[in-house]
A protein has these predicted regions:
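A short linear-motif detector with a strong N-terminal bias
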Residues: 10-13, 22-24, 62-64, 104
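ATP-binding pocket architecture of kinase catalytic cores
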Residues: 32-136
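Juxta-kinase regulatory segment immediately upstream of eukaryotic protein kinase catalytic domains
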Residues: 1-20
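ATP-binding glycine-rich phosphate-binding loop
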Residues: 14-35
């Protein structure tokens, strides 16, 4: 984790005081929440494939340029195996909809709004995200 802590300090200017592992979702990457005394949490990612990491970082930059709501990659290690990205919190969409699923699909108005916003964003990601995308 030293490489993530060094990357954090170089990027933020602050010492990392906590580096806590967080669960990954079906990925071979390892994820960590890094914070300093002032807060400033970032997610540190350690991958095993430079190509996969490069693709993720490229897509993040492309989607941000396209004004799409995706995590920003802040820093990438020299070897391309580690990077820092925005910390979007602990709650996934799947988690946020759990109560509605448990109630047999009877979602609250808040849960329905989350679903509506998510579904509405998908075509935008496909259309705007596909413009000028290097598919090679």
């Amino acid at each position: 984790m030293d490489i993530l802590k060094d990357l954090y300090k170089t990027h933020t200017g602050f010492e990392c005081v906590a580096c806590e592992p967080i669960p990954g979702a079906g990925s071979n990457r390892k994820y960590y929440r890094l914070t300093c005394e002032k807060g400033n949490p970032l997610i540190g990612v350690v991958g095993t494939s430079r190509d996969e990491n490069h693709a993720f970082c490229y897509l993040s930059k492309h989607f941000i340029t396209s004004k799409l709501p995706v995590p920003h990659v802040h820093a990438i290690s020299d070897d391309g195996l580690c990077y820092l990205q925005d910390d979007l919190g602990d709650t996934t969409l799947f988690d946020a909809l759990k109560a509605g699923r448990d109630a047999g699909g009877r979602y609250t108005s808040h849960e329905k709004e989350l679903l509506r916003r998510t579904i509405a964003a998908l075509p935008d990601i496909q259309i705007r995200g596909g413009r000028n995308l290097d598919f090679s």
